[in-house]
Amino acid sequence: MEHTYQYSWIIPFIPLPVPILLGVGLLLFPTATKNLRRMWTFLSIFLLSIVMIFSLYLSIQQIFLSCIHQNVWSWTINNEFSFEFGYFIDPLTSIMLILITTVGILVLIYSDNYMSHDQGYLRFFAYMGFFNTSMLGLVTSSNLIQVYFFWELVGMCSYLLIGFWFTRPIAANACQKAFVTNRVGDFGLLLGILGLYWITGSFEFQDLFEIFNNLILTNRVNLLFFTLCAFLLFVGPIAKSAQFPLHVWLPDAMEGPTPISALIHAATMVAAGIFLVARLLPIFIVIPSIMYIISLIGIITVLLGATLALAQKDIKRGLAYSTMSQLGYMMLALGMGSYRAALFHLITHAYSKALLFLGSGSIIHSMEAIVGYSPDKSQNMILMGGLTKHVPITKTAFLVGTLSLCGIPPLACFWSKDEILNDSFLFSPIFAIIACSTAGLTAFYMFRIYLLTFEGHLNTYFLNYSGKKSSSFYSISLWGKEEEKNLNKNFGLVPLLITNNTKRASVFCKKTYKISNNVRNQTFITVENFGLNTRTFYYPQESDNTILFPMLLLLLFTLFVGAIGIPFNQEGIDFDILSKLFMPSINLLHKNAQNFVDWYEFFRNATFSVSIALFGIFIAYCLYKPFYSSLLNLTVLNSFQTWSSKRIRWEKLINFVYNWSYNRGYIDAFFKTSLTESIIRLAKQTNFFDKRIIDGITNGVGITSFFVGEVTKYIGGSRISSYLFLYLSYVLIFLTILFFFYFEKF
């Protein structure tokens, strides 16, 4: 076993040859490199698979032996300072290695098909390989300097991948926003690292924890300065894991390709912040105020992310805010001192969210053949609906991921989220109420996404008249339509517009689908000329096997990965893998608890959390399912609005929630007004001062000298004798004045 640990240093470097060789190949041999692009994909998957096998072996050793292995090499710069670098293998490292490699391999397989049409196919895989290398290096680092180095590489790779389609201004702005926002967190992290080194004189984790705890116990250091350094360390994870208030970059990061959205939200960038807080928890845990700040930031993020996801129309942005909320749960658990629950939820959420993002990518891939390659159309849930019969495998996978995130047993996220909710009651009743309420909101917005996407009828070809010109629930616009005056608005529901032609709408569509009987029995309206080119309506088709295969594997993970943390412990005997892996574990909430589980208490708590989730699902079904039912007359529904003043208050509440979510809680607007515009004004004033004042003084001196020289040249007439006469005259005048003032003193 010791022999295996000695070669652990190679883990981050195994995937590195692919991006290096791709970069060299594209520069020197572009044609040959592009012709062999499938070979590079296979090599990327193969090398990451080697890392996965190595990581599995290390994890098995950690389960049975629960040991920590560290190997450090020293690089002496001078007699007073030496830099040490190495690798650090413990249970946290082994879990992160498995998470990164398993999700990374599946995303690479998925990307082979998803990005096959893109001209930047090889560039994408080069970035992905470098991204995986950076994250593997981060989790195996043995000191804070290495952590910061790989931390910055992770940020750089995310910048490159978010702005992968850099010719699109929205994507270019999104990657800049992510980069600048994370610079704020990274600067705080750097200050915290330097402050910690100034106190302890070490960057190594084990030395750092020991020295830090000794200084706190012996009260030999300023506690306020310690707290400041610890908070600055926490600022980095706030930005990287999209915690309030540095979360604003996360929804814009959806401008990147969908596979990288899955990787960022599941196993790499946002997981890096949770990993660092978990790694530094022995430092945070001795400062109660910092632990409370961590939990407070976490609970605010939990609620904020859930409320911002309530009315999103873009399917990827809805999932992005869901990620933000779930990361808040993990941060809340770490702030409460529930180390095991936080990492358990990190694992279960990673596989569930990767499944949801890959499922959304499959949906987008199918919709692009119908509505085109504009994200405003292909990712808009308002234009979807009725996809169950068109993409049944994707629908099943997406439903499993949705149920898991809602906390429905026996799926993965149920076990971890239930543990966090139970621990929150032990920590703070107020935090517990917010966490439980947000669990209901999670179920609501996730099933809202599911219902808008898969239930009802395909809304791309539908024009819905409800008696109102605008509504956040059922206003569906038809792309390219002319004025609506051509239609009879007495219809309560116009479910289908039929035009006559046999031309194919897209080269990707191979067949049409028959209309179901329940639609066939409804009122139809035929429009011979609606201002559009006549064409036949085509429907999305299921994605290729290369896209479906990773989704099915992630579905299996979502079904069974929760088993590693199911509390089967009885009479002090630990049967679950997670307990063995984290023994001894940090848990401030169960210091005096028994080693076995009270099943009655477990089922009681589980029943409560599942009831909240089912209530959220029921509300979502009531609000969204009817609007996509072919039996509902929306004009009749709208007539109920005049019956009661409560209906008006309900509409106001809906509009408030919609505006809050659509405007991102007005936080982006606040930053734009208070920071961005202020910085722009300051930059303009600085530019004015530099150009007008600083440059004005310099240019003024130069111009003055020029004119003095010109005047002198004009008076002297360009003759040396004249210059000598003027020079002697000035000297004589100066001496006369000096002589006069000198004798006046006497």
UniProtKB/Swiss-Prot annotation:
Membrane-spanning intervals of the chain: 9-29, 40-60, 89-109, 125-145, 147-167, 185-205, 221-241, 258-278, 280-300, 327-347, 354-374, 396-416, 425-445, 547-567, 608-628, 723-743
Molecular functions (GO terms): NADH dehydrogenase (ubiquinone) activity; quinone binding
This enzyme's EC code(s): 7.1.1.-
Keyword presence, NAD: yes
Reaction catalysis annotation: a plastoquinone + NADH + (n+1) H(+)(in) = a plastoquinol + NAD(+) + n H(+)(out); a plastoquinone + NADPH + (n+1) H(+)(in) = a plastoquinol + NADP(+) + n H(+)(out)
Major enzyme class: translocase
GO cellular component, one term: chloroplast thylakoid membrane
Localisation per UniProt entry: Plastid, Chloroplast thylakoid membrane
Family annotation (InterPro entries): NADH_UbQ_OxRdtase_chlpt_su5_C, NADHpl_OxRdtase_5_subgr, ND/Mrp_TM, NU5C-like, Proton_antipo_N
Glycoprotein as UniProt keyword: no
Main localization, broad class: plastid
Topology relative to the membrane: Multi-pass membrane protein
GO biological process, one term: electron transport coupled proton transport
Keywords from the named record: Chloroplast, Membrane, NAD, NADP, Plastid, Plastoquinone, Quinone, Thylakoid, Translocase, Transmembrane, Transmembrane helix, Transport
Pfam family, one: Proton_antipo_C
Subunit relationships: NDH is composed of at least 16 different subunits, 5 of which are encoded in the nucleus.
Function, in words: NDH shuttles electrons from NAD(P)H:plastoquinone, via FMN and iron-sulfur (Fe-S) centers, to quinones in the photosynthetic chain and possibly in a chloroplast respiratory chain. The immediate electron acceptor for the enzyme in this species is believed to be plastoquinone. Couples the redox reaction to proton translocation, and thus conserves the redox energy in a proton gradient.
Assigned protein family: Belongs to the complex I subunit 5 family.
PANTHER family: NADH-UBIQUINONE OXIDOREDUCTASE CHAIN 5
Protein's UniProt name: NAD(P)H-quinone oxidoreductase subunit 5, chloroplastic
Provenance organism: Lobularia maritima (Sweet alyssum)
Protein's gene: ndhF
